[in-house]
């Protein structure tokens, strides 16, 4: 617990130094396992602001049907709804409907856990041509306490995700963006945890963004 408090104190002290450039994301990740089967449901909602709190940027809702092919491999077929507003006025809102397919591989190395996520997206964006996108993300979770990833355990969470566009349009570059994240997590229960972290998003020719992420991670089971 002392390690957690020290890390949270460090984040609280350093964030004001560049708070004017920070964006805020509030996220809920849920996974509902269906009885003793290999099927589960992924549910997710994200609220993204141009400021840490306030000036809405984007709302994302995602749901997916998952199937565990192997102990180390989960596949997903899902749908996402994304509502986006521009910075300032006018906010020029637009909607995106997104279908995605995903494969998630996991393995351990010592006490650390690693996940490799491959995702293919079909994007239907309002007033734009259809385009696809490929994403690869490497996650690593490293325990900080003897409890590991169980109740009252704390851990470091890092990931890096690359986005590549798939489009028949010379004006759309192949590189879309890259996200690098580092944070600290804590498990309130075996099936409920929270993470607080920082993410830098490189969006190519546009100015990169600094983001503070507060995320809740919840596993449920239908008996």
Predicted regions and their residues:
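Start-of-domain marker
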Residues: 20-78, 85
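Transmembrane beta-strands of outer-membrane beta-barrel pores
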Residues: 34, 45-51, 79-85, 107-111, ...
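Transmembrane beta-strands of outer-membrane beta-barrel proteins
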Residues: 39-43, 75-77, 114-118, 136, ...
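Residue-level signature of outer-membrane beta-barrel architecture
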Residues: 32-34, 67, 105-107, 142-144, ...
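Residues that define the transmembrane beta-barrel architecture of outer-membrane proteins
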Residues: 20-26, 57-59, 95-99, 130-134, ...
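Bacterial Sec-dependent N-terminal signal peptides
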Residues: 1-24, 220-222
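Short loop/turn motifs that connect adjacent beta-strands in outer-membrane beta-barrel proteins
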Residues: 34-38, 72, 108-113, 144-154, ...
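Outer-membrane beta-barrel "beta-signal"
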Residues: 103, 209-223
């Amino acid at each position: 617990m002392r390690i957690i408090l020290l890390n949270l104190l460090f984040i609280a002290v350093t964030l004001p130094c560049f708070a004017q450039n920070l964006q805020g994301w509030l996220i809920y990740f849920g996974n509902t396992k269906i009885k003793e089967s290999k099927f589960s449901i992924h549910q997710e909602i994200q609220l993204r602001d141009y400021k840490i709190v306030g000036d809405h940027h984007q709302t994302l809702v995602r749901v997916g049907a998952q199937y565990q092919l192997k102990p180390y491999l989960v596949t997903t077929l899902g749908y996402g709804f994304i509502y986006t507003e521009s910075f300032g006025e006018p906010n020029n809102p637009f909607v995106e409907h997104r279908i995605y397919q995903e494969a998630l591989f996991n393995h351990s190395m010592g006490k650390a856990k690693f996940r490799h996520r491959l995702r293919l997206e079909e994007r239907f964006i309002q007033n734009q041509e259809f385009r696809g996108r490929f994403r690869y993300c490497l996650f690593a979770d490293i325990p900080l306490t003897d409890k590991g990833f169980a109740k009252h355990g704390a851990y470091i969470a890092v990931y890096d995700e690359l986005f590549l566009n798939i489009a028949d349009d010379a004006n759309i570059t192949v590189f879309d963006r890259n996200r690098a994240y580092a944070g600290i997590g804590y498990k309130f229960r075996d099936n409920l945890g929270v993470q607080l972290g920082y993410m830098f998003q490189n969006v190519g020719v546009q100015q990169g963004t600094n983001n503070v992420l507060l995320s809740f991670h919840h596993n449920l089971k239908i008996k």
